[in-house]
């Protein structure tokens, strides 16, 4: 369940109702939207009401239903379209773009951009069908997500039937998802099959951690292959068999090689202190409606990867790791 944390600054001089404070901040929402969207509200780790009083130093956590709002405004935001037909749009999402509107990000999301794009291409083919009627039949069917700072492939459905068809493939784990990443540190082996439980970190609820000695949390499996190394850095390909929140980031930390630029799970690197998250969804293999065979989509590797690799090649000799038999 998505959540957002708000720490009340020391500059707040008086106590105020929780809902009034949330409405006053830039990423906030009014009481009616908060009441209809929020699934749970925590104040300093304990359940709270909208009428609860808050003061400086308090920490509010709002957990909301993972549903896409219906009142989304189309926005003219450039998109990198990989593939499109009457049922789907496949996009190479940019790093820094949120997938869909939610608390803290009501605009400039992928869904806002898609609605504008679909509006442009919704040209009536029949005289008795209006553009608005075409748009009403199209809804932002988000069947999987990428973290805000993760770039790469996202497939979206244009109608309910396609959304259900694609969602069932993700649910049954029939979709192949492959990522490319640059890490600080080397994996313990040239390849491996990581199987753990992923649980929320009790000390920092924004984070998750991987555990093997518990049945709590959710099972997660990631298959990795180290492509090459440059000194203490490594280029890794990961195929995930499950789709847990922060899964690759958590599993890489578990292996002792945090993803470069991951501000949540690692400290800034001395050689790359300001680099963005070096995690990219490279490949997606899935069946499309009406097609018998699986379709393989690939997203171009972004320039930030080549910039980092260029610096690494100047400083360290390249070590190519041995090829291994693919783990199923």
Could you tell me what each predicted segment is?
Residues 1-193, 197-199, 298-307, 311-312, ...:
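RNA pseudouridine synthases
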């Amino acid at each position: 369940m998505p959540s957002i944390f708000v720490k009340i600054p020391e500059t707040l001089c008086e106590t105020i109702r929780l809902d009034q404070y949330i409405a006053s901040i830039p990423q906030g929402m009014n009481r009616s939207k908060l009441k209809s969207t929020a699934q749970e509200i925590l104040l300093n780790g304990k359940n709270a009401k909208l009428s609860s009083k808050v003061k400086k130093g308090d920490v509010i956590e709002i957990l909301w239903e993972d549903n896409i709002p219906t009142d989304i405004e189309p926005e003219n935001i450039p998109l990198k379209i990989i593939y499109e037909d009457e049922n789907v749009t496949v996009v190479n999402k940019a790093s820094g773009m949120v997938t869909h509107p939610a608390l803290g990000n009501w605009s400039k999301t992928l869904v806002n951009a898609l609605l504008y794009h679909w509006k442009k291409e919704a040209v009536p083919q029949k005289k008795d069908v209006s553009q608005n009627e075409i748009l009403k039949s199209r809804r932002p069917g988000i069947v999987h997500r990428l973290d805000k700072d993760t770039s790469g492939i996202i497939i979206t459905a244009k109608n309910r039937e396609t959304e259900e068809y694609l969602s069932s493939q993700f649910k049954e784990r029939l979709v192949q998802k492959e990522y490319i990443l640059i890490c600080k540190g080397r994996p313990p082996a040239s390849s491996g099959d990581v199987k753990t439980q992923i649980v929320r970190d009790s000390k920092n609820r924004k984070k998750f951690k991987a555990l093997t000695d518990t049945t709590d949390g959710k099972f997660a499996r990631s298959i990795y292959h180290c492509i090459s190394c440059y000194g203490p850095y490594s280029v890794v390909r990961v195929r995930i068999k499950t789709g847990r929140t922060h899964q690759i980031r958590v599993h890489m930390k578990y292996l002792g090689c945090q993803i470069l630029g991951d501000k949540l799970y690692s400290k800034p690197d001395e050689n790359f202190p300001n680099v963005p998250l070096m995690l990219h969804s490279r490949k997606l293999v899935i069946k499309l409606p009406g097609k018998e065979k699986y379709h393989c989509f690939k997203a171009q590797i972004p320039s930030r990867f080549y910039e980092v690799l260029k610096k690494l090649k100047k400083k360290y000799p390249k070590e190519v790791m041995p090829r291994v038999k693919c783990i199923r």
